[in-house]
Amino acid sequence: MRDDVNQSFYDVLEFVRIFRRKNKLQREIVDNEKKIRDNQKRVLLLGDLSDYIKSETSIEGIQVIIANMRNDYEDRVDEYIIKNAELSKERRELSKKLKNFKESTID
């Protein structure tokens, strides 16, 4: 009987741990989506800026800087997309564990 109580207690602790991790992942995903949107807006801004700048010698240097900044922002967007996919995958796995955990404790 005591082992059953201990096991149930540890099962509840594990359930809480998984549930908290799942919620944390969801918050990180939302945060990354915001970062993706922000950086996509920066990419558009820099694209518009490049369209308006005239191609004089001194401005060419500015265009090179803008192009480099744009590439940096695009790289960040890609990194956040990859990170978001990884977080989503882990969240799905935790959801499955929680579902299986609930089903096994009900039986």
Swiss-Prot record:
Q: Which GO terms describe its cellular component?
A: cytosol
> Where would you find this protein in the cell?
Cytoplasm
> Which residue stretches, if any, does this entry annotate as coiled coil?
70-104
Presence of keyword Ribosomal protein: no
Pfam families per the UniProt record, alphabetical? DUF496 (PF04363)
What is the protein's major site of localization? Answer: cytoplasm
Superkingdom field:
Bacteria
**Keyword list, A-Z:** Coiled coil, Cytoplasm
| Physiological role | Pole-localizer protein involved in the regulation of several cellular processes.
Q: What NCBIfam families does UniProt report for this protein, alphabetically?
A: PRK05423.1 (NF003844), PTS_reg_TmaR (NF040881)
* HAMAP family, sorted: Pole_loc_TmaR (MF_00683)
Would you identify the family this protein belongs to, as annotated? Answer: Belongs to the pole-localizer TmaR family.
What is the protein name stated in its UniProt record? Pole-localizer protein TmaR
> Which species does the entry assign this protein to?
Blochmanniella pennsylvanica (strain BPEN)
